[in-house]
Amino acid sequence: MANTSSAKKATRKIARRAAINKNRRSRVRTYVRQVEEALASGDKAAAQAAFKAAEPELMRAATKGVIHKNTASRKVSRLAARLKVLSA
């Protein structure tokens, strides 16, 4: 248990940041899932629209430190490759 006032404040800040990070990570998962569902259904237009929305969300999460930059790049790359196969 935190004893000093600064430690108590730090605990509150950590809880706030954790909630923000959890929300951002959840948003990323939602956007990625929407792309994957559109790819699975074979709807090219919906998949492209979902991908355009998901890519900046992934990169924003990487910028904010929620996920690693390489992880975000890998996810974007793999989704783009699957979208390219669908388009071909």
UniProtKB/Swiss-Prot annotation:
SUPFAM superfamilies: Ribosomal protein S20
Keywords: Ribonucleoprotein, Ribosomal protein, RNA-binding, rRNA-binding
InterPro entries: Ribosomal_bS20, Ribosomal_bS20_sf
Region of interest called Disordered, as start-end residue ranges on this chain: 1-23
Record-level Gene Ontology MF annotations: small ribosomal subunit rRNA binding; structural constituent of ribosome
One Gene Ontology term from the biological process aspect of the record: translation
One protein family per Pfam: Ribosomal_S20p
GO CC, any one term: cytosol
Family of the protein in this entry: Belongs to the bacterial ribosomal protein bS20 family.
NCBIfam families in alphabetical order: S20
Function: Binds directly to 16S ribosomal RNA.
Protein name: Small ribosomal subunit protein bS20
Provenance organism: Mesorhizobium japonicum (strain LMG 29417 / CECT 9101 / MAFF 303099) (Mesorhizobium loti (strain MAFF 303099))
Gene: rpsT
